[in-house]
Amino acid sequence: MNAATLSGSELEVYVCPACKSHLMQEDGALRCPTCSKAYPMRQGIPDFVLEELSRSADPELRRMRFIDQMARIYETKLWYPVILKVFGGFSSRSFAQLISMVVGKVEAVKGRVLDIACGPGTFGRRIASPSKQVFGIDVSMGMLRQGAAYTAKEGITGMHFARARVEALPFADGFFDATLCCGSLHLFTDTLTALREMARVMKPGAVLAVFTFTAGRGGVLRYRQVRARMRRDHGLHVFELPEIEQYLTDSGFEHFQPDVSGSILTFNARKQPAGKFPF
């Protein structure tokens, strides 16, 4: 993928997030022949968001200005290791253990993997290969550019990045064999819409692997006052286990298998078989 274009095989992957039509490539952009929307390519990364962070009325997008700035430290000891111990507790899993556990849930999957709110591909880069294509989406262009730089430096093939929102994914129905959603489900404004959109683009029986937070027994998130303040000030929603299981059921997933370490929640579930849910 160069700065201006996608390869033919990559172009076939994406659809218009507005009308789900296949796209054409011209003049450095992806264009929809059905609804006429155009999505620019930015340093080789297709942008399906089309909104400047500084001008957005959406609090989730405004937060991305901060996320853009921390892209370079995101995978250092200054970020996740600290977050996991403060939020999850000192007895919770290490960052390396967490990555290994989550990617292990989809490691045996053959085919295409969607990496939701992928950041710089922290989880997806570990499993991307010529035989396992990983498509990461995030609203932070800073994170995506950092991920593209890491991917090139590490010589990884099979990792792709696009700027898109989880509520309007630029992929066709039933396209993916598995989905990762790591460190982000608790930040989505509408959890049900996000999960239903993930289910839409997954094949029946496909695996969903998630890392998020719960009101557990470790870290500051075990305190109700802290959870309330994090929700109010930062939009961080800490899930109860019955709550997240209900969200999954209402989104077309089954076989919820949670694992709690301190206040860190990892789980996997499967999209219901065809015919059991509307999508």
Regions found by a protein language model. Give the residues of each.
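A short SAM/SAH-binding and catalytic strip from SAM-dependent methyltransferases
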Residues: A178-D190
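Short alpha-helix
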Residues: L236-G252
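A short acidic, Gly/Pro-enriched loop at the edge of an enzyme's catalytic core
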Residues: E167-A178
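A short glycine-rich, Lys/Arg-flanked "PGG" loop and its adjoining helix->strand segment in the class I
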Residues: L192-P204
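Conserved class I S-adenosyl-L-methionine
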Residues: Q43, V49-A108, T122, R126, V207-R232, ...
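Class I SAM-dependent methyltransferase SAM/SAH-binding core
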Residues: R112-A168
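N-terminal auxiliary segments of SAM/dcSAM-dependent transferases
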Residues: N2-R65
